[in-house]
Amino acid sequence: MEDDSLYLRGEWQFNHFSKLTSSRPDAAFAEIQRTSLPEKSPLSCETRVDLCDDLAPVARQLAPREKLPLSSRRPAAVGAGLQNMGNTCYVNASLQCLTYTPPLANYMLSREHSQTCHRHKGCMLCTMQAHITRALHNPGHVIQPSQALAAGFHRGKQEDAHEFLMFTVDAMKKACLPGHKQVDHHSKDTTLIHQIFGGYWRSQIKCLHCHGISDTFDPYLDIALDIQAAQSVQQALEQLVKPEELNGENAYHCGVCLQRAPASKTLTLHTSAKVLILVLKRFSDVTGNKIAKNVQYPECLDMQPYMSQPNTGPLVYVLYAVLVHAGWSCHNGHYFSYVKAQEGQWYKMDDAEVTASSITSVLSQQAYVLFYIQKSEWERHSESVSRGREPRALGAEDTDRRATQGELKRDHPCLQAPELDEHLVERATQESTLDHWKFLQEQNKTKPEFNVRKVEGTLPPDVLVIHQSKYKCGMKNHHPEQQSSLLNLSSSTPTHQESMNTGTLASLRGRARRSKGKNKHSKRALLVCQ
């Protein structure tokens, strides 16, 4: 009865899963018996699941759920490309996937953490906030990631992108604990990062002799999938949650009947993450060789069949980022990523190059890491963008617009004049790609004007301006005397002042002809001195 009372009070024990790169619980899990009730106990399995929804009592809630940003602060359009500093493609690809993670980006753009953080230099959250803000607010540009992002990880050679990804996520999680170093493991799992990326595994062992049940819960930040025998992500997930028989040498030592007996072990997801990171195990742990096979993955993924409660309705996730490795080994090759901007358009992020893509191209890659977000979360962020972004400080929008326009002018001297209308700048920065933005500029640029009649008032009285017909053949056929007169006049020697005026007008006429070379209806001007 002692076990029963512990169970009813919800006092469960957990094993802290410290190695983030290996997310599947296995035999290394300590088997913690939370109950010794047989199968026919009044407390059924379903009842036990409902009772432990909160998993464990939390001494301190480090990031209350209500503090998560509820609406989007992200610009609708795609942001900046990232400069490769030398074998840093794995850094760039990982950072782009994190930058376009809606809950994380919204929190970073709210600047909530930096306003209360007292150790900005060594804080990964502050460093990521600065990076994400720069990347999203500089569309069409290429920025250089801060060296602090890979400090302690990058050693001048290419590393594994997934390892760097989880190194960054773990560092952000630790940055949530500067003033809470003495908190228990359960409270550490209430950080903002765990609320975004984290969930709990449930490893259940059922004794086939006495029907006693032992449950182990462990937190996760990503899920590793074995693809050796899987042709799709769904097949890999099915293999992950497939019951395993424990018998013979692997028989289970039951804590209820105190015997070694056959048992059934089942691994399921007990709580779901807002953002799901699925890692396809493409590289051998020994040789590093790559499993270069196509594994299908869907745009929408229902995770409900793999949960502890499989019959509670669909739990749909939508794809928003894909990290790809091109090459034959984890020691070489190239990393790039595909991300879905807030506007819904897919983009290929290949270091400094940012190009529009399609969902067909995205789903045809040999993916290494897949990023999914709960459909309800994505729709909520998308709806907030369609309604308009949150109010900002007075004048902040105009300041950002002028800054963006000034940067574009410095980078592109040909765009220095004239300035665009405000509504065109707004549309370009929020809804258009860089190419579309340049197209709009060219369409709305004021064309150079040259009207010879405006010059006539400045000419000396002894200079005559004659407008030749655009139909040369007409003058030649019907007015030969005018053609001859023009030739004679043009061959005469002008005075010094006339020569200066003639040269000036000829130069102006040349520029006008070049600027209007595509206008078939423009008239030619011929200067004749009397």
From Swiss-Prot:
InterPro entries assigned to the protein according to its UniProt record, in alphabetical order: HABP4_PAIRBP1-bd, Papain-like_cys_pep_sf, Peptidase_C19, Peptidase_C19_UCH, USP_CS, USP_dom
The keyword Metal-binding is assigned to this record: no
Compartments it resides in: Nucleus, Nucleolus; Endoplasmic reticulum
Basic and acidic residues bias locations: 382-392, 398-412
GO biological process: apoptotic process; positive regulation of epithelial cell apoptotic process; protein deubiquitination involved in ubiquitin-dependent protein catabolic process; regulation of apoptotic process; regulation of protein stability
Tissue: Expressed in heart, brain, liver and skeletal muscle.
Record region (Disordered): 382-412, 477-530
Stored CDD domains: Peptidase_C19E (cd02661)
USP domain segment(s): 80-375
Stretches with biased composition (Polar residues): 493-505
Keyword Glycosyltransferase: no
Enzyme Commission numbers on file: 3.4.19.12
Catalytic residues, chain numbering: C89, H334
Gene3D superfamilies associated with the record: Cysteine proteinases
Residue ranges, compositional bias (Basic residues): 510-524
Keywords noted in UniProt: Apoptosis, Endoplasmic reticulum, Hydrolase, Nucleus, Protease, Thiol protease, Ubl conjugation pathway
Catalytic activity: Thiol-dependent hydrolysis of ester, thioester, amide, peptide and isopeptide bonds formed by the C-terminal Gly of ubiquitin (a 76-residue protein attached to proteins as an intracellular targeting signal)
GO MF entries: cysteine-type deubiquitinase activity; hyaluronic acid binding; RNA binding
Gene Ontology cellular-component terms listed: cytosol; endoplasmic reticulum; nucleolus; nucleus
Family from the record: Belongs to the peptidase C19 family. USP17 subfamily.
Stated role: Deubiquitinating enzyme that removes conjugated ubiquitin from specific proteins to regulate different cellular processes that may include cell proliferation, progression through the cell cycle, apoptosis, cell migration, and the cellular response to viral infection.
Name under which the protein is recorded: Ubiquitin carboxyl-terminal hydrolase 17-like protein 24
